[in-house]
Amino acid sequence: MNEKYSKKTYRLLFGAMTSVFVLAGAAGASAETLESALARAYGNNPDINAQRASVRATDETVPQAKSGYRPQINGTADVGRTYTEFDSGTPRTVFGGGTTTSRLTPRGFGVQIDQSLFDGYRTTNRVRAAESSVLGSRETLNTTEQSVLLDGATAYMDVLRDTAILDLQRNNVEVIDEQLRQTRDRFNVGEVTRTDVAQAEARLAAARSEASLAEATLRNSIAVYRQVIGVDPAQLAPGRPLDRLTPRNVDAALKVGLNEHPAIKARQHAVDVAELQVKIEQGALAPQLGVSGSVNQRYDRNQEGDNALSASVVAQLTVPIYEGGQVYAATRQAKETAGQRRLEADSVRDQVRAAIQSSWGRLEAARAQIQAAQAQIDAAETALNGVREEARVGQRTTLDVLNAQQELLNARVNLITAQRDRVVASYSLVNAMGRLNSRALGLKVNHYSPKIHYDQVKDLWIGLSTPDGR
């Protein structure tokens, strides 16, 4: 094997080595960072924006519930035309006899006010249930934001990983192509056999296949990145794990997750809503007290030119005695639903616990894999250098060299994959703990506050326009 072949091959192999460190290298001035990509997703992702709209819609249930405290005012107006013909049954010559007719236009208007004074605390409990629903929807929004940010971090690291692997695979094609050319030259001078050439040709075909597969994988990762982040990836800066948000041990992670995860809080609010619904249904069995007032003005009611003004105030007490059993059935149903919500809350706690333990295990495994892959690269490089030197003096075959190169390639791919897995696992752990939010990550965004919209609508009596929540 001549010196020219050795130098060119070493240059190609060294170029492949630089791809290994693409996940940990320095970022260019114009490169997109992981934090800036997540900021894009936070502001533009349709899943997050849809959930924000859902929270705003849930806010409106509070003023709806409060309407039970407020009066119901209705205005009425009517107008008609009447024709009356009266035959007295006596001759027209007799006083008051004959037939008389009357044409009137009766009309009038009025206002009625109904005010509930006591409804078995149903309105009070409806307001409390609506407020709990609002709090639950906010926690669901937090869960959605966390999921999108995790998806964004995963998509970002997948593009970095697949770009680096594609670079390795393309470089591997160049290395093997150069080796095939040199093997053919050696075959022409009788240094190797036709078998050596065939082995190099087969390995080149396999390398091209792997490069094509790596390119397809990268395209898929780019598509996912576009879906989550909202733009196509350009130059991406290296991603780094969230070590500053990672606790020292799994027990600390579990303590945080079980106390803070928004999915658990959302289920707890759902339990509150279900328990209040039981009280709402039971309230239908309580006496109902209300007062009604009305004012009416009538014209031409009995004869042309007459008018009448009337006003009334009526207090009404209704005591339910038996309503067919519907309220009792609805109350039992609400109790069963409350039990279901408690079980669902327990299930979510178990899911959070399992997610934390699983994410912690993946993070520990990724750290170990990085160390193992680095050691594997060192050993594979040493082995390749030795095999190449032995091949110079005829003690190794072309296949031995190809195998050693493949081992080194595999080690580099393993390191890239492990680097990606460590970053994603750290984000997964923080997500499982319930702390993967825009503020904890320090994203440079306008942080969305659902309380602003809530304060704008919670006490509105009238109005059709929708506040923007800003």
Report residues per predicted region.
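Bacterial Sec-pathway N-terminal export signals of envelope proteins
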Residues: A29-D78, T84, S116, P233-D272, ...
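Small/polar (Gly/Ser/Thr/Ala-rich) solvent-exposed segments
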Residues: N49, Q72-R92, T99-L104, D114-T143, ...
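Periplasmic alpha-helical coiled-coil/stalk elements that build and connect Gram-negative outer-membrane
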Residues: N2-R11, S147-L258, R362, A366, ...
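Amphipathic alpha-helical coiled-coil segments
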Residues: A50-A65, T144, V148-L168, E178, ...
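Acidic, low-complexity, intrinsically disordered peripheral segments
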Residues: N2-K8, Y83, T417-R470
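Transmembrane beta-barrel architecture of outer-membrane proteins
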Residues: T33-S36, P106-G108, T154, Q199, ...
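Gram-negative bacterial Sec-dependent N-terminal signal peptides
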Residues: M1-S30
